[in-house]
Amino acid sequence: KKIKWLNKQSLLNFKEIEVTSFVPKKIVPQFFDAKIILNEANKISNLTSSVLVPNLFGAKKALELNAQKINYVLSASESHNKANVNKDVNSSINELNEIVNYNNYLEKKSSISVAISTSFGCSIEGKVSPKKVLNIVEQVTHLGVDEINIADTVGYGNPYNVKYLFKHVIEIAGKDKIFAHFHDTRGLGLANVIAVLELGIFKFDSSLCGLG
């Protein structure tokens, strides 16, 4: 069913799909077939197959299987990062550095993207300072990642604070590296998309029927 879904989406002109995740099977068993799915996705013409990874181990597995793009995830919120990947934020950034360095030594390099989750707030610790997010943006930009996904993981963003943060992110990393991920928790998902479009960013990370 997963492979059938991927083929159908590619026919609808989606150029990039996050096809699977290389995460511990004991924690997220539904990705037990990650290797099979990635191998099949790589056969689809005109599709960039990206893979979510939480650590260096997962990244190495994905790169060994020729993942065209690595989506590494960390959180601006310390509490959320600890709950999600069992690390503090600095440790996650250090591990991202290891992934970038590992990828650079490969004969066939993949694109490295990092998602900064809880960029507008956290369900565990509440408000997340824009300064914290911008500090992370500076660090990951310096590491040489190809893309940065500013993610409103819990849907706390509004057009005002979205524009404020993205303007400063653009100053650090430029428009070409940046894309956005919004949730519609408070009915502001589309309004936030428009706010970012007005700044000249045209790439968004989305899901199908709320799944993904």
List PLM regions with ranges.
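Alpha-helix-loop-beta-strand connector modules within alpha/beta enzyme cores
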Residues: 27-51, 91-113, 160-180
